[in-house]
UniProtKB/Swiss-Prot annotation:
HAMAP family: Adenine_deamin. The keyword Manganese applies. SUPFAM superfamilies: Composite domain of metallo-dependent hydrolases, Metallo-dependent hydrolases. Gene3D superfamilies: Metal-dependent hydrolases (3.20.20.140), Urease, subunit C, domain 1 (2.30.40.10). This is Adenine deaminase. It catalyses: adenine + H2O + H(+) = hypoxanthine + NH4(+). CDD domains: AdeC (cd01295). One of its GO terms (biological process) is adenine catabolic process. It comes from Ruegeria sp. (strain TM1040). Its cofactor is Mn(2+).
Amino acid sequence: MTHKTFPSWPDVAPQLIETAAGRSPADTVIRNGKWVNVHTREVLEGHDIAIKAGRIAYVGPDASYCTGPETEVIDAEGRYMMPGLCDGHMHIESGMLTPAEFARAVIPHGTTTMFTDPHEIANVLGLEGVRLMHDEALLQPVNIYTQMPSCAPSAPGLETTGYEISAEDVAEAMTWPGIIGLGEMMNFPGVAHGDPKMLAEIAATQRSGKTVGGHYASPDLGPDFAAYVAGGPADDHEGTCEADAITRMRQGMRAMVRLGSAWYDVEAQITAITEKGLDPRNFILCTDDCHSGTLVNEGHMNRAVRHAIDCGCDPLIAIQMATINTATHFGLEREIGSITPGRRADIILTSDLKTLPIEVVIARGQIVAESGSIKVECPHLDWPESARGTVHLGHTLAATDFELAAPEGANAVTANVIGVVENQAPTKALKAELPVRDGLVEGEGDVCQIALVERHRATGGVTNAFVSGFGYEGKMAMASTVAHDSHHMIVVGTDRTQMALAANRLAEVGGGITIFRDGAELALVELPIAGLMSDSPASEVAANAQKLVEAMQACGCTLNNAYMQHSLLALVVIPELRISDLGLVDVRSFKKIPVIEPFNE
């Protein structure tokens, strides 16, 4: 495997010096721009930038002295020259795209650096999958740093996965060239209670001088939170309110605030800056999970920065939260995150800092996008057969696999029901009185069935439960092999025959998302790589995903980003109630609970 290597600052320092001194011409000069200086939080008019060997040699009022006859000159025409945007925490797989196609989608939006945790593929393919993601990331014309996944499974004992990450895996990955740290430590009870495996992973990361990502998805900010912070995680993106952000920053963590496809956590937390006046240096913007439709139609980190500004944040502070703050957190402030000498020449030209139109994107000194169009190649790996064909059900499913028997003699039961909350990761633990017909518990009203079908080891296992909040009507079902984080197959439906049809269809195509109604397939997004990603262009995947959205709406669901909500119902590290291949999980207590409450005649 041949990676693209980018020369280090020490390697090219002699060339930078010669250019800055005027003894050697720059490769590229950007003239007549407004310099957005994120170190001093100011805009300086009438500045030039000189670039040599992909790095910045000079920023000042006049670069004509280091401009030669072969120098490429770009006229900024008075536009703002700001650093390329950084996504501080994200999962490429959530876009349903490979790293190459994800890069193709986000580069025109001004994203030049990503810190990605491929724990989705780790749950399916293990270390091999992580290495494939890492290797394709290193081929790209922008900076994609990989965090080694920490928790597969995310909650040991409450789910099974296709692979279990070990401390030895983490130690090995820390030697890979593109690894920047440890991915989000989702097993926060394990850290808080001193689990040896979790602590060994953290130790291997810290001893290599790298950053430990956090994930503390609990409202309890007492001793358990204190113990978690003491264990080593350096940031957290699971905050949902102002107090969460403030508490994390006061304890020395970076508060990562996310605007993804289904996450809208910026507005509630940014008041710590805009109203409380706290130091914004420890605030970082991220996306966490963005599906392809969001990337194609709305943007990426430019969307997050604009949203922060719309929430009352000063534009320069919002830009810092997506550039220098992120770079500093990962120890890369001498490499990326600002337009200053020695740094990679990752630059955006924009005519407005508030609405942030991304007009020209430069990465490593070359124009990579202009006026919304990509101008470079984003190379693909040749994904091996082991990464495809990962849906193993063990047998063809039938409607009977989705039956949930009632206690003997019951005409109705009390069920524990997963309640979906629009635009938020947490669910609600609800109870509902459900009817019994022919000895089987049936959904009623807004309560329909949910099942998790084991797909990694062909056990034939199916866990059945109930969910509310989707608003589905008629005889329908939706199935997906994107089922965070264990990525078995999740099926939601109002009719068990449709559920079987949808599940078997995904086994046939090797993974993806489908929706059936009255025996007919309404939409299909094929995701042949690990059942999580497509190597087709983002526009094509987004178009198919839009058909999926329209099909869900036709079946009565009007939730925003409903299929993202659908994919999160097995995420057993975010409260309150989730489904796993081992049963129904109350994440508040990290214990399995019965679907049907005990019945007393």
